[in-house]
Swiss-Prot record:
Biophysicochemical property: pH dependence: Optimum pH is 6.6-6.9.
Keywords: Cytoplasm, GTP-binding, Ligase, Magnesium, Metal-binding, Mitochondrion, Nucleotide-binding, Purine biosynthesis
GO biological process, alphabetically ordered: 'de novo' AMP biosynthetic process; AMP biosynthetic process; AMP salvage; aspartate metabolic process; cellular response to electrical stimulus; IMP metabolic process; purine nucleotide biosynthetic process; response to ammonium ion
Organism: Mus musculus (Mouse)
Main location: cytoplasm
Annotated segments matching region Disordered: 1-24
Activity modulation: Inhibited competitively by AMP and IMP and non-competitively by fructose 1,6-bisphosphate.
Positions that bind IMP: D40, E41, G42, K43, N65, A66, G67, H68, T162, R176, N255, T270, R334
Protein's UniProt name: Adenylosuccinate synthetase isozyme 2
Gene: Adss2
């Protein structure tokens, strides 16, 4: 006899609620900042803006393959692994379980930024690291380089990775052979044994790989002493933050939607989920605590490394965008490929992430153009397609349909309100809003914190 047929508990309430108390909902909401293109959109600047009155700033995925630049008081800080919001002295920075951590890289990054200015004073007391975060070892990075070399030799092309060990460490994680922060700080003898097993596995897979096992363990022991006070139960920490007194919690996404391991232009992607779902799995929090989701969009499009790029301008236009925008990767120093804004890919990113508003950055880079093109549709074999193709070969074949808008030929870098922008610049912003059906909340017209125009 089934409950649905005869149990009074199933029928006692009109809504089918069996009389049990509902789980407590509510709590603080997190504000999420995500890249909506192929990275390098200016997420760091938006985070810097929001972090000024934040209590906690989180990283939920990726490693030191990401690159964020923040300019404060004319000092340029570069972040790869640390949440860039840590530059606010009142912020607690949290690195979640979805992040992969190269300890030498973490301390090197912190020390370089400490030398630049006062932004990172006391950072070690303001950083919390999830005990469930996986560790990137030097041999992961070495293996990354060997894999790229093998791809080049075998297929004539590589993935264009940053060689920071991100793919190999996420592979170790999925294969359940990886090591986590909790292993390092809880039982170093047990950690050492597992480290040796993993290192020897890598040596058997890559015979040319040289690993100084004892030397690296000695180095890791030194890092363990420094890192131990920062390592906490991340799930408990965040739960307390979400359900305690009111707090402003900010999540800083790394990489971007089109680099997501599932939804990006696979295989030319990163190895983590950099869309909104990665926020919940990478921090250990339920989706009902996600509040605003801000997508960061460059006023044109760039991409580092190889992979399909429908609106790319491999010509004087692309060169002008590259030069004016100073489009070099923060992590690798590689030139970024440049092209027109692609609304097809942005609509796709919105379908996945549900952006509540956009930050449109680097609008000033378009100042010199008499006309500006925007990709509004893809055609394949002469027919418009309603979706963003999953297959790279198909994406490489699409013909982009453009809408041409008049430029403004005016320096807009001193504009501080929307009304101060030329009419054609205003129209460009409104066109993007109308096409995507997402409001633009900020417009970037320069590098500094002050050059972000807020619309609402």
């Amino acid at each position: 006899m089934s409950i649905s047929e005869s149990s009074p508990a199933a029928t006692s309430l009109p809504n089918g609620d069996c009389g049990r108390p509902r789980a407590r909902s509510g709590g603080n909401r997190v504000t999420v900042v995500l890249g909506a293109q192929w990275g390098d959109e200016g997420k760091g600047k938006v985070v810097d803006l929001l972090a000024q009155d934040a209590d906690i700033v989180c990283r939920c995925q990726g490693g030191n393959n990401a690159g964020h630049t923040v300019v404060v008081d004319s000092v340029e800080y570069d972040f790869h692994l640390l949440p860039s919001g840590i530059i606010n002295p009142n912020v607690t920075a949290f690195i979640g379980n979805g992040v992969v951590i190269h300890l030498p890289g973490l301390f090197e990054e912190a020390e370089k930024n400490v030398q630049k200015g006062k932004g990172l004073d006391g950072w070690e007391k303001r950083l919390i690291i999830s005990d469930r975060a996986h560790i990137v070892f030097d041999f992961h990075q070495a293996a990354d380089g060997i894999q790229e070399q093998q791809r080049q030799e075998q297929a004539g092309k590589n993935l264009g990775t940053t060689k920071k060990g991100i793919g190999p460490v996420y592979s170790s994680k999925a294969a359940r052979s990886g090591l986590r922060m909790c292993d390092l700080v809880s039982d170093f003898d047990g950690f050492s044994e597992r480290f040796k097993v993993l290192a020897n596995q890598y040596k058997s897979i890559y015979p040319t790989l040289e690993i100084d096992i004892e030397g690296e363990l000695q180095q890791l022991k030194g890092y363990m002493e420094r890192i131990k006070p920062m390592v906490k139960d991340g799930v408990y920490f965040l739960y307390e933050a979400l359900h305690g007194p009111p707090k402003k919690i900010l999540v800083e996404g790394a990489n971007a939607a089109l680099l997501d391991i599932d939804f990006g232009t696979y295989p030319f992607v990163t190895s983590s989920n950099c869309t909104v779902g990665g926020v919940c799995t990478g921090l250990g929090m339920p989706p009902q605590n996600v509040g605003e989701v801000y997508g960061v969009v460059k006023a044109y499009t760039t991409r580092v490394g190889i992979g399909a790029f429908p609106t790319e301008q491999d010509n004087e236009i692309g060169e002008l965008l590259q030069t004016r925008g100073r489009e070099f990767g923060v992590t690798t120093g590689r030139k970024r490929r440049c092209g027109w804004l692609d609304l097809v890919s942005l609509k796709y990113a919105h379908m996945i992430n549900g952006f509540t508003a956009l930050a449109l950055t680097k609008l000033d880079i378009l100042d010199m153009f008499t006309e500006i093109k925007v990709g509004v549709a893809y055609k394949l074999d002469g027919e418009t397609i309603p979706h963003f193709p999953a297959n790279q070969e198909v994406l490489n074949k699409v013909e982009v349909q453009y809408k041409t808008l008049p430029g403004w030929n005016t320096d807009i870098s001193n504009a501080r309100t929307f009304k101060e922008l030329p009419v054609n610049a205003q129209n460009y912003v409104r066109f993007i809003e109308d096409e995507l059906q997402i409001p633009v909340k900020w417009i970037g017209v320069g590098k500094s914190r002050e050059s972000m125009i807020q619309l609402f």
